[in-house]
């Protein structure tokens, strides 16, 4: 089923999302990859505040290519989510509600998704140029020394994704394999 959703992603929104749903996201989302996730966790370990408002936030695992003149961002395809698996449960426990990436997630992340009524979306790998057309604004907000891995705030319109793991832990990667094997 196709659903149009707007950030911030709240529990009311995740309650209506099911594994296999196609979604079109509009609103502000953050971009962070493994180096930025590591720094955020280190900040928390030192008793510092996070550089982003994590409550009901969506984090897109992506490192963009440079923007062409007149464009807010270059190619913006998803990166492999498993690299964030050691950091994601803590951020989910602090209020993050959605992640966008590609690939499978660990049991620990799935447990945190269920515990926090969150959701994991997949974006289509290899479609970064197409996905960038949905990004209307891009701003580096911290860790600019990380270059493409800096934390960015994006404004997206009708950004396409698929619900892979819903708030109940239903996992499209597992159900699709079972369905295909029939």
Task: Please state what every model-predicted region is.
Residues 31-32, 36-159:
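Feature captures the catalytic cores and cofactor-binding loops of soluble hydro-lyases/lyases
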